[in-house]
């Protein structure tokens, strides 16, 4: 459902990024190979995603991003009825890492009460000059359209919010 803004970029100030960095550093995250919902994988490349990830479930950390997501929801004109937040997915991409084209909102209902993911966010935690690749492509049109997507390589502390069904 594409209505309102296609995406919204928020720039966190360096103090906030430092706090997020410190918080994550002190969490003792158990990084594991990233997995893609196997039900969604039928006939697809098993190397769709090559990265490490951990799930952050700490309530105050999640609430901080939930509150920002609510404000972005309003400012972007999406007007979703947001009732909660998933644990935050923290990912690390090494040399050769990737996550090919996908839709964040799968076909399966993931939450009690029938809720689905509505808003996604990617927060860039490194400056673009610290790595090669790492472009974020957001599709906003049909695959046969030109252009059909926009490419982002944002500075450290920038977050892109977008509707999960694109």
Sequence positions of predicted segments:
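Fe(II)/2-oxoglutarate oxygenase catalytic core
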Residues: 1-159, 165
């Amino acid at each position: 459902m594409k209505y309102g803004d296609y995406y919204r970029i928020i720039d966190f100030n360096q103090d906030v990024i430092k706090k997020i960095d410190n918080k994550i550093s002190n969490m003792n995250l158990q990084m594991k190979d990233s997995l893609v919902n196997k039900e969604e994988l039928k006939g697809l490349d098993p190397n769709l995603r090559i990265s490490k990830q951990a799930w952050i479930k700490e309530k105050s950390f999640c609430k901080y991003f939930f509150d920002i997501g609510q404000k972005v929801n309003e400012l972007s004109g999406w007007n979703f009825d947001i009732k909660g937040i998933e644990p935050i997915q923290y990912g690390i991409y090494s040399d050769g890492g990737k996550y090919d084209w996908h839709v964040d909102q799968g076909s399966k209902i993931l939450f009690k009460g029938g809720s689905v993911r509505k808003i996604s966010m990617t927060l860039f935690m490194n400056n673009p000059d610290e790595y090669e690749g790492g472009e974020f492509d957001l599709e906003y049109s049909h695959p046969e359209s030109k252009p059909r997507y926009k490419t982002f390589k944002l500075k450290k502390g920038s977050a892109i919010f977008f509707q999960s069904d694109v």
